[in-house]
Amino acid sequence: MAEEHQNRLQNAVDSMVKSLERDNIRKMQGKMFRCSAQCCEDNGASMQQVHHCIERCHTPLAQAQSLVTTELERFQNRLSRCTMNCSDQAKDAFDSGSKEAQVKAQLEGCVIKCAEEHMNLIPSMTKKLKDALAQADK
C-alpha cells in the first residue's frame, strides 16, 4: 500500500519535471544555442570575447536548471524528514511494547500520509517553478 503511494508520488514528480523541461527548459536551451551561435559568427571578436559571450548566453539556462534542482532537493529533503519522523514514531512505539504488526501498520499509515501530503504540494511547486522559469527566460 505505501509502495503504491510512493510510486504515485514519484510519477507525479517525474511528470512535473518532464513538463518543465518540455515547456520551459527546452525553449531556454534553444535560445542559448542560438545566442551562442551568434557569438561564434562574430569574426571580429577575440577567442576570449567569444568565450565570454557564450558564457553570458548560458547563464539564464544554468540558473534555471539550478533553480529546478534546488527546489527538487528541498522537496526530497522535506519528504525524507517526514518519513524519518514516521520511522522514529514506529521505533518509539515498538520500544514501548507495541506489537510488531501494530507498529508496521502505524508506520505504513504514516508513510502513506507523508506521500499524500507531498502529492498536494506538487501543484504549487509546479506553479512556483514555472513562474520562476518564465521570469528567468526574459
UniProtKB/Swiss-Prot annotation:
InterPro entries, per the entry: DUF842_euk
Q: Which Pfam families match?
A: DUF842 (PF05811)
Alphabetical GO CC annotations of the entry are:
cytoplasm
Top-rank taxon: Eukaryota
Q: Which residues cross the membrane?
A: none
What family does the Swiss-Prot or TrEMBL record give for this protein?
Belongs to the FAM136 family.
Q: Which PANTHER family does the entry mention?
A: PROTEIN FAM136A
Instruction: Give the protein name, as stated in the record.
Output: Protein FAM136A
Native organism is Xenopus laevis
